[in-house]
Amino acid sequence: MKIHCCVMILVLIAGSILQIPIWKWCVCFCLFGLVMALELVNTAVEAVVDLVTEEYKPLAKLAKDAAAGAVLIAAIMAVFAGVAMFAPEGMRFLQEVIG
């Protein structure tokens, strides 16, 4: 979760520098919320599984892996969406800085 928070701070800084439009801010905040909500669900699933059993059980592993996989998929999709949204402003910024 610390990595997600650090990335969120970097996105906020980049968005401010690039002056992205308001709708892109809205999408960014929705994606932040989605990833963080899934992190909380993942934490809850892991805590409940650990509370129920301390021994290895295939279904417990499946529950933990599925919850972690949901976070991973959401984070990867957020990165793809972020790259697509920031690309035009990023290219414009680079052209102004370089040329």
Residue ranges and their predicted role:
Residues 1-36, 52, 56-58, 71-99:
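Hydrophobic alpha-helical transmembrane segments
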